[in-house]
């Protein structure tokens, strides 16, 4: 379907095609003539870091708001949207509306993987805290520049940080 992309970390179907994160890019691919090869190949975002393998961009996931969420990774860079500067990212995650391609920063900025529950509450993780709840979503924090929130995420794992991890691969 697609060749010459390095290290894809996430795939999310949309509108007959797929969004793919392959650090340092977010792509959109679509087959328009039925030959099982992507005829549309768009580089949507670029600039994600590749320096820390446990914290590269990843995790395309639909939210209840019909936006796609993903971890931007911990590599601070200024992202380029279709070749033009978008905004710098550091310890945040992102979401975007796939119809308008409007991007926003969201609370997170941890490592690999995240999820939403049935009520839209977002959970993130890192290698030392395997389950954290996003308590203060960025879209609410940015409404009041005078509100200083501490602890944007909280640890919710019953067994605490640094719980045993068991491989499922050989």
Where are these regions (language model features)?
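Beta-propeller domains with acidic blade repeats across secreted/periplasmic ectodomains
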Residues: 1-170
